[in-house]
A protein has these predicted regions:
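Conserved beta-strand-loop surface patch within small alpha/beta domains used
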Residues: 1-81, 90-137
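Short, well-ordered beta-to-alpha junction loops that form the rim of enzyme active sites
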Residues: 87
């Protein structure tokens, strides 16, 4: 995937992700974002809320079962897996060293929400961590 110029959410999607992050606090919340990877700008179409099996305030893991289910429903909806979302309940929305490691393995947009400053930021790995503007339409 090339580096998109922006990642675009609807107001409702932003509210859904914020609410889910608050519900999961003090642990990290996670979700899989569906869209269309052919777009120069990634427009998020659907959100697949996932369980953080680590139940940790500093890490997240999505089970293989849920990953398989997510890929299955993306395919049914003729959408691509366009991003990975997780929250940072106790820190700013910058990738942790663990995040950076997994971003390199999985070079699609990573969206991080911080519960402490109510901010969404997106990044992608492309020979280094690059920030992608988050837009709300
Ligand atoms: Zn993180």
């Amino acid at each position: 995937m090339t580096t998109p110029k922006a990642i675009i959410f609807s107001k409702n999607q932003i509210e859904t992700l914020k609410k889910y992050s608050e519900q999961n606090s003090p642990n990290e919340a996670c979700a899989i974002l569906f869209g269309n990877n052919t777009d120069e700008q990634v427009i998020i179409k659907e959100i697949f809320l996932a369980k953080n099996i680590d139940e940790s305030p500093v890490n997240f893991t999505i089970s293989n079962e849920e990953l398989i289910a997510a890929y299955g429903s993306a395919e049914k909806m003729k959408l691509d897996v366009s991003g990975i979302f997780h929250s940072h309940p106790v820190s700013v929305p910058h990738p942790s060293s663990t995040d950076k490691k997994y971003m390199e393995i999985n070079p699609i947009p990573w969206v991080i929400f911080s519960n402490i400053n109510d901010e969404f930021k997106a990044y992608i790995y492309n020979s280094g961590i690059i920030q992608i503007p988050v837009k709300v339409l």
